[in-house]
């Protein structure tokens, strides 16, 4: 699993737990809905740290809380 895939999956999990739709997440985070949908799109290969931070802020969680899951401990190194 790539870092981007793990990030998108983590946001999907959190939003599902909190019953938050992508448009609502965008509104809470102060970003465009297209930014959220782009981040969730499996065809997109990257996600910016700035976007992750804004989305975490919109969910009232820290980056530490977001990344503190085994999902991120098991990632393969990405060589480009």
Predicted feature residues:
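The alpha-helix within a helix-turn-helix
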Residues: 15, 26, 56
